[in-house]
Structures are given as structure tokens and as C-alpha cells.
Amino acid sequence: MSKRTFKIVILPGDGIGPEVVAEATRVLEVVSASSSDVEIKLETHDFGGCSIDKHGEPLTAATLEACKLADAILLGAIGGPKWGVNSKVRPEQALLALRKALGLYANIRPANFASDSLLAYSPLKPSVARGVDIIVIRELIGGAYFGERKELGARAQEDAAWDTMIYSVPEVQRITRSRRQVASPDPPLPVHSIDKANVLASSRLWRKVATETIQNEFPQLKLDHHLVDSASMLIVANPKKLNGVILTENLFGDILSDESSVIPGSLGLLPSASLAARPLWPNTAHRRSSPRRVYEPIHGSAPDIAGQGIANPIGTILSAAMLCGTRSVWRSPAKAIEAAVEGARRQGDRREGLRTADLGGSSKTKDIGHKVVEILKATL
């Protein structure tokens, strides 16, 4: 029987993106080679700043079409000072357009410690950081980033700029229901809904609809509400109070997910996934029953270290593990990838072990990738 093909579009992006994605790609190739019934087909495309340089736009029609027909997408990182915020064409426009086109409405981002040995790298005191285990679910395609806006004009009478933050009942219901995408222990993780209901009308709608949806559809879940300014203080003063699932809208989630992600000490360690509600286009190769998703590390393009081969690829490799974990035929390889990362990390706990510069070591990006692949090959 011939192997079923699973198409993954690779978007290395800018800065350190190509370096860390290369190591995750090696991991996916090992998984594909070890499978008797599924073959991974990798297809690389320009995205972000590198696409601007080559094609004059951050997301070409060809790249978008490839993403629409893919089973999953693995993204590195985009952006850099080369393409400044005042440029009319910016790398970040590619990400917003991709989210909208694919219906990627929810981003899931964890913030936790794989080992207590990493507590020393947290900006928080060990007594405050120990035991933090937060998952941020951020709404991705609504709110201020996608509302109507007006830029500052050149004429005197156009001396103002504005953005609008709009949310509908169905949008809030959809993101609240995405809570089911997070595997839960027994008892289930509590949900902390974050808003600014004391000031914003959209937040008052958010709080009302989130409460009704949880009460009517997930009565077993514990739900509480925090104002965004209070939540931002808790994340640095007593983050364990927010252990569980943080559920919030686009702008607040952008800020709070970045704030919580620095608690583990290195942005290079953590993966993330962006989810679509359902397949929006037929795949001519085979029918799919699961929605399209984008997987990426939480870090940025880090142009200051790009090309030096010292970026930490663990977050990208774990993003590949998340990708595999969504497919029943690859749940075992997903766990094997996570175990291989843990094996490489344990070596890093030793004085002369494997650690990249962000964790106080001198290992190269390829050193980490090689060790993970070595352990993975011995396991699969």
C-alpha cells in the first residue's frame, strides 16, 4: 500500500528563522522516514521581509495558495529593522494576511518550565517563578488589529489617527469554545478571562458572552475575570495565580502572551500553534477532517544574532512536535520528539552540556538539532 502524503509548507522567514526551521525540518524528515504509512512532503516558500526583498510583497499569491492547500504550516520568524515600522510594505502584514485568509482565529501559547534547572534564567525570583504553568489563548483575527482605521494625514485637517476595536457575539463564542483544544487534566484547568470591561464596550460584550458560553457549554470549568491591567501586574508579581488558561482578545493577548513567555527565561524554548475553525478549501490530494494550523516558536527574528548559528532551536522543534501531535498517526512520534528534546536538555543541565547562548552556554544551533535528531533516530 502506498504512503499517504502529508504536505507541510515551510516558511523560514527572516533573521534566525531559517536557522531554527532547518533543525525542525531535520526532525520532520526523521519522522517521515520512520513512518510506514505516511510521507511528509515539505515545500518551502518566501514569507515576510525576505519576500519583500525578492518579490516586492510580504505574502505572494503563490505562497498563500500553497498555504491554503497545505495540511499544516511551520513558520520561523519575520521582521527586522531593515523593514521599519514607517515602511508602507512591512513583513508583519504577511502574518496578518495569512491569519485572515486561513481563518486562524486562535493562538495557543504555553509558558512553563521544562525543568527547575531553568529557574535560574527567569527574570523572576525562583520562589515566584517555580510552578508557573500558563497557557494563553489569544483571539487572532478580530479587535483593533482588524478594525477600521485611519492613518495620520498630510493636511492640517487630518491631524488625527484612529483604530476601532470591534467584537461580535459569534467571535467571542468561537474563541471561548477553543478552550476544548487544550488537553485538560482532571480536574480541568481553570479559565481566566482577561478584558477591560470597566472602560470598553467591546470588553463588556466579551465578558458577558464568555461567561454565558462557559456556563452553558462547559459548566465543569472554573471561570474568573481579570482586568488587563490587573492581569499584567499578576504575571510579574504572582503569576501562579493565573495558572491554567488565560483567554483574551487580540491586542491584550499580544501583550500578555509576550509578557508571560519571558517567565521561563528564554523565548527560544517555547512553541505555539494558531488554529482554524475548519478546512476552508478542498485539498485535491486527499480529504482532511481536521482544520489547518500554523506552528511557530514564540520568539522573534532576532536580527542581532542572525547568521551566527547560536539561536536556540528548541521552540521550533517543539512546534514541530505540536504539529505531529494533532495527527493520530503521529502522536507517538510527537511524544518521541518531546522526549528527544528533554534528553538533549538533560545533557544541557550538566556543566559542559548542550546549551545555547540564551541559556548561558556556547553550543551552536546545529549542535542542539543534531543531538535531538540523534536521540530521535534511536527511539523511532
Swiss-Prot record:
Q: Where, per UniProt, does this protein localize? A: Cytoplasm
Q: Which InterPro entries match?
A: IsoCit/isopropylmalate_DH_CS (IPR019818), IsoPropMal-DH-like_dom (IPR024084), Isopropylmalate_DH (IPR004429)
Which of the seven top EC classes does this enzyme belong to?
Answer: oxidoreductase
- State the UniProt keywords alphabetically: Amino-acid biosynthesis, Branched-chain amino acid biosynthesis, Cytoplasm, Leucine biosynthesis, Magnesium, Manganese, Metal-binding, NAD, Oxidoreductase
- Any idea which GO molecular function terms this record carries? 3-isopropylmalate dehydrogenase activity; magnesium ion binding; NAD binding
What's a GO biological-process term for it?
L-leucine biosynthetic process
Protein name (record): 3-isopropylmalate dehydrogenase
